[in-house]
Amino acid sequence: MAVEKFETALKKLEEVVKKLEGGELPLEDSLKAFEEGVKQAAFCSKKLNEAEKRVELLLKQKDGSFAREEFRLDDE
């Protein structure tokens, strides 16, 4: 299975949402689209969580140098 990119999954999710919001799909097709949307949303969420863990902030020190600090959310 090929590795999917976040941007590709997000585009697929947006397409699914557009189809579902159109309200023209038969029930069975709506269910299939919904399942695909859930799959794409979970993938995007996972990728965002992974990216968040990798974010680092560069903070300028008083001496002009930079120090790395791991990104932390306030609720952690």
From Swiss-Prot:
Bidirectionally degrades single-stranded DNA into large acid-insoluble oligonucleotides, which are then degraded further into small acid-soluble oligonucleotides. This is Exodeoxyribonuclease 7 small subunit. Its main location: cytoplasm. It comes from Geotalea uraniireducens (strain Rf4) (Geobacter uraniireducens). SUPFAM superfamilies: XseB-like (SSF116842). Pfam families: Exonuc_VII_S. Its EC number is 3.1.11.6. It catalyses: Exonucleolytic cleavage in either 5'- to 3'- or 3'- to 5'-direction to yield nucleoside 5'-phosphates. Belongs to the XseB family. One of its GO terms (cellular component) is exodeoxyribonuclease VII complex. Transmembrane segments: none annotated. Signal peptide: none annotated. It comes from the Bacteria. The keyword Cytoplasm applies. It is found in: Cytoplasm. It is an enzyme of class 3 (hydrolase). Coiled coil: none annotated. Keywords: Cytoplasm, Exonuclease, Hydrolase, Nuclease. One of its GO terms (molecular function) is exodeoxyribonuclease VII activity. The keyword Nuclease applies. Heterooligomer composed of large and small subunits. InterPro entries: Exonuc_VII_S, Exonuc_VII_ssu_sf. One of its GO terms (biological process) is DNA catabolic process.
